[in-house]
Design a protein with these regions (language model features):
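N-terminal alpha-helical interaction blocks
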Residues: 1-92
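Short glycine-rich, basic-tinged beta-strand/loop micro-motifs
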Residues: 2-10, 139-148
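Generic detector of ordered, mature protein regions
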Residues: 35, 39, 136-139, 143
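Aromatic-enriched hydrophobic runs in primary sequence
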Residues: 51-52, 63-65, 100, 121, ...
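Cys/His-rich short segments
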Residues: 79-139
Length: 148
């Protein structure tokens, strides 16, 4: 089964609450429930809460969503992890990341991975000063200090 992810992160301007408050709030709204296990980095994995399927919509003609592990080492089910907070924003992308565009002129960056190590660069289309976070990722990648 492919590992699909939905990553949520607070806006860059938002003050980051302590992780404990994030965990409590996610549980209070019914997105999560008890901790299932910890991964090799010691980060908790939370089981889907009672309102998980009301808060997150899975599209398709007949999506199959497993909410419980079938065995102790199972990771092929829907669960929630919290990463961070990190001192500096981290860039997140995946194998299905679409090429971003310049927010000024809409120039398309097909070879965006080559730019990932640069702090800033000038747009090939209009010359605007850009960075990875300022590109229009169309919700397929982005940066953050806290990831859910």
């Amino acid at each position: 089964m492919p590992h699909s992810k939905l990553i949520l992160t607070p806006s860059p301007e938002a003050a980051l609450p302590p992780t404990g408050q994030v965990v409590e709030r996610l549980s209070a709204i019914g997105l999560t429930r008890e901790t299932r296990a910890t991964d090799v980095a010691g980060q908790a994995a939370y089981l889907a809460g009672d309102r998980f399927l009301q808060l997150i919509t899975f599209l398709g003609c007949s999506p199959f969503v497993r909410l419980e592990p079938e065995h102790p080492d199972d990771s092929e089910f829907s669960h929630i992890r919290i990463r961070g907070p990190f001192a500096e924003p981290l860039f997140r992308s995946g194998p299905n990341t679409t090429p971003p565009r310049c927010p000024v002129c809409r120039h398309r960056y097909v070879h965006w991975r080559e730019l990932a190590e640069q702090d800033s660069f000038n747009c090939e289309g209009c010359g605007a000063n850009l960075s990875m976070p300022t590109l229009n990722w169309r919700q397929s990648a982005g940066t953050g200090r806290l990831f859910i």
